UniProtKB/Swiss-Prot annotation:
Annotated keywords: Cytoplasm, Elongation factor, GTP-binding, Nucleotide-binding, Protein biosynthesis
BP terms from Gene Ontology: ribosome disassembly
Source superkingdom: Bacteria
InterPro entries: EF-G-like_DII (IPR053905), EFG_II (IPR041095), EFG_III (IPR009022), EFG_III/V (IPR035647), EFG_IV (IPR047872), EFG_V (IPR035649), EFG_V-like (IPR000640), G_TR_CS (IPR031157)
Function, in words: Catalyzes the GTP-dependent ribosomal translocation step during translation elongation. During this step, the ribosome changes from the pre-translocational (PRE) to the post-translocational (POST) state as the newly formed A-site-bound peptidyl-tRNA and P-site-bound deacylated tRNA move to the P and E sites, respectively. Catalyzes the coordinated movement of the two tRNA molecules, the mRNA and conformational changes in the ribosome.
Record's GO cellular component terms: cytoplasm
Protein name: Elongation factor G
GO MF annotations, alphabetized: GTP binding; GTPase activity; translation elongation factor activity
Protein family: Belongs to the TRAFAC class translation factor GTPase superfamily. Classic translation factor GTPase family. EF-G/EF-2 subfamily.
Binding site for GTP: 17-24, 81-85, 135-138
NCBIfam families in UniProt: EF-G (TIGR00484), PRK12740.1-3 (NF009379), PRK12740.1-5 (NF009381), PRK13351.1-1 (NF009891), small_GTP (TIGR00231)
A Pfam family reported for this protein in Swiss-Prot or TrEMBL: EFG_IV
Length: 697
């Protein structure tokens, strides 16, 4: 079966923004106008097509990024709707990794908000070209020009308006198209499906002329032919302007700005035009780089072509109630037929693809073959996880894995009955496969199952899904901070595990050096044993013993990280040595070495941004200081203050209720993980004695 859509007629885009900026509503309107959905879904009514999990429909937020395909002007657009809540940052990171372009949605009243900055930084990391859509132009206080200023100030980039609004707030009627120099007014009675092209209103003519000059100047800076025409005052055609905007956008030199109100059905078609005209096709972005499976130093290149070997990256795993596990992936090169076999690089095994599905939010269409540039879902891949590369087994390649942040918050869950215990095990396994920022472990002291994640909302939704989708009855504890441990100085120690009680004994003896590593590095193991003092087959078990001991912590049972361990000497016994003996010796050695290396407790510090009316600023800042917070700065926006601070997570539980009562419901805040820092001695002592008190009882 041959390809039906040429690569240059494809767009893989994401819609990303701050929570409540209107991403899902925007996507719903796109589906309506491209003819994919016959009734518009509303987020606040809980009927949005893209928000298909019960938890999403209840809360009116998007948790999973649903992938959808639609068409506009004969161009196939694959859209991924991403969550804007900071607890679901991993979803955004994952979807940006596989996209070629994005529409960044901003609220016309608030402009750039904290999560907008996070999403923007993630898009910068993956060099994703973006269009800025200033949404909610019909809201009271909507200000297009202020929003553009916040993009300059807070995102430190170059937004270039290619449209201007006609009116604002309830008088927002349409837009001025600066390329065609015409006005567009939407008709309310047709749900915005039809619009009238008008002359630019008199009061906007001068402004439109001025902004068109700015636009042409911005694009001609990156195009010599245009620059020459611009300086000479020669006429520049609309097609040349469009080509110039496209070139500068794909090169990340400018970010075109458009506006509208998705909820009131204004500006969506012109946004689709901008997606088609200015965002890249898979051919416009650099070829994907990967690593050689056998030689990680060697870089391999895969071009977006059906003739290259097949390679794809799995960016999402979901459990569908009807077809079972779905693996969403982006094809970078080659093609694959339904029922074919693929090589899973991470698991080093071949797997058969049962069916290939093209998703339309929660409806699915079966397809026979997929090609370079496609985004689709597969059924039947048994051992697949998020971030895995699947490829042609004759030409293996490792596409860049996706880095996910460490969880910062945890809670204990206990199944109510024996039957619940089995169900819970299965539910947790499936949920962890879908979401790599959700981790699970069993507390060795209490035997409780501990779930850890990116925030209170993240864990609340996981527990909710566990109970609803998998029918698990469970008692849930209060959220707690995920502390960590590390060391502050070098030390040495030896571990000797010797048991000789007649017959087959046990003998393992190791000597190690430990040293602290920079924050965020993790664990490093170096084998420096020479002269066969420890046989090769015992090196791995020694490392395993060390790793497991560090996972269990030294001070207070929290995982220890940022440690380098060098195994430099030891001894063995021909008969009595075993893998288990060396594993135990490794564990003994690291416990002793870590105790001597000044172990300390680390806590997650959150970047907290509080938005309050000016009158409450003093009180709120005083309260943040009381929570061991550091104020990083404040800025004035209208008559509200934005307070930026770094506060320990342990001091932030219940802050949502507290800030509301402190500001009579007028204050709000957002927070995301900043970094791990050492806990002050007094607090550390309290935490350690609390943990040790529990274990001695």
């Amino acid at each position: 079966m041959a390809r039906t859509t040429p690569l240059e007629r494809m767009r893989n885009i994401g819609i990303a923004a701050h929570i409540d900026a209107g991403k899902t509503t925007t996507t719903e309107r796109i589906l309506f106008y491209t003819g994919k959905s016959h009734k518009i879904g509303e987020v606040h009514e809980g009927t949005a097509v893209m928000d298909w999990m019960e938890q999403e429909q209840e809360r009116g937020i998007t948790i999973t990024s649903a992938a959808t395909t639609c068409e506009w002007r004969d161009i196939q657009i694959n859209i991924i709707d991403t969550p804007g809540h900071v607890d679901f940052t991993a979803e955004v990171e994952r979807s940006l990794r596989v996209l070629d372009g994005a529409v960044a949605v901003f609220d016309a009243v608030a402009g750039v908000q904290p999560q907008s900055e996070t999403v923007w930084r993630q898009a910068d990391k993956y060099s994703v070209p973006r269009i800025c859509f200033i949404n909610k132009m019909d809201r009271v206080g909507a200000d297009f020009y202020h929003s553009v200023d916040t993009i300059v100030d807070r995102l430190k980039c170059r937004p270039v308006p290619i449209q201007l609004p006609i009116g604002a707030e309830e008088k927002f009627l349409g837009i001025v198209d600066l390329v065609e120099m015409r006005g567009i007014i939407w008709r309310d009675e047709t749900m915005g499906a039809k619009y009238d092209v008008i002359e630019i209103p008199d009061d906007l003519k001068d402004k439109a002329k001025e902004y068109r000059e700015h636009m042409i100047e911005a694009i001609s800076e990156h195009d010599e032919a245009l620059m020459h025409k611009f300086i000479e005052g020669q006429p520049i055609s609309n097609d040349e302007i469009r080509a110039g905007i496209r070139k500068a956008t794909i090169a990340l030199q400018i970010f075109p700005v458009i506006c509208g109100t998705a909820f009131k059905n204004k500006g969506v078609q012109t946004m689709l035009d901008a997606v088609v005209d200015y965002l890249p096709s898979p051919l416009d972005v650099p070829a994907i780089e990967g690593l050689d499976v056998d030689d990680p130093e060697k870089t391999l290149i895969r071009h977006a072509s059906d003739n290259e070997p097949f390679s794809a990256l799995v960016f999402k795993i979901m459990t569908d109630p009807y077809v079972g596990q779905l693996a969403f992936f982006r094809v970078y090169s080659g093609s694959m037929k339904s029922g074919g076999s693929v090589f899973n690089v991470a698991k080093r095994r071949n797997e058969r693809v049962g069916r290939l599905l093209r998703m339309h939010a929660n409806k699915r269409e079966e397809i026979q073959e997929i090609f370079a540039g496609d985004i689709c879902a597969a059924v039947g891949l048994k051992t697949i996880s998020t971030g895995d590369t699947i490829c042609d087994d004759a030409h293996p390649i490792v596409l860049e894995a996706i880095d996910f942040p460490m969880p910062v918050i945890q809670l204990a869950v206990e199944p109510k009955t024996k039957a619940d215990q089995e169900k819970m095990g299965m539910a947790i396994q499936k949920l962890a496969q879908e979401d790599p920022t959700f981790r699970v472990y069993t507390d060795p002291e209490t035997g409780q199952t501990i779930l850890s994640g990116m925030g209170e909302l993240h864990l609340e939704i996981i527990v909710d899904r566990m109970m609803r989708e998998f029918g698990v009855g469970a008692n849930v504890g209060k959220p707690q901070v995920a502390y960590r441990e590390t060391i502050r100085k070098n030390s040495e120690a030896e571990g000797r595990h010797v048991k000789q009680t007649g017959g087959h004994g046990q003998y393992g003896h190791v000597k190690i050096r430990v040293e602290p590593l920079p924050s965020g590095t993790g664990f490093e193991f170096v084998n420096d044993v020479t002269g066969g003092r420890i046989p090769k087959e015992y090196i791995n078990p020694t490392e395993m013993g060390i790793k497991e001991a560090l996972e269990g912590g030294i001070l207070a049972g929290y995982p220890m990280s940022d440690v380098k361990v060098t195994l430099y000497d030891g001894s063995y016994h021909d008969v009595d040595s075993s893998e288990m003996a060396f594993k135990i010796a490794g564990s003994m050695a690291i416990k002793e070495a870590a105790k001597r290396a000044k172990p300390v407790l680390l806590e997650p510090i959150m970047a907290v941004e509080v938005v309050v009316p000016e009158d409450y600023m003093g009180d709120v800042i005083g309260d943040l200081y009381g929570r061991r917070g550091r104020i990083e700065g404040t800025e004035l926006r209208g008559n509200t203050r934005i307070i930026k601070s770094m506060v320990p997570l342990s001091a932030m539980f219940g802050y949502a209720t507290d800030i509301r009562s402190r500001t009579q419901g007028r204050g709000s805040f957002t927070m995301h993980f900043g970094k791990y820092e050492e806990v002050p001695a007094a607090q550390a002592e309290e935490i350690v004695s609390k943990v040790q008190g529990k274990t001695t009882r």
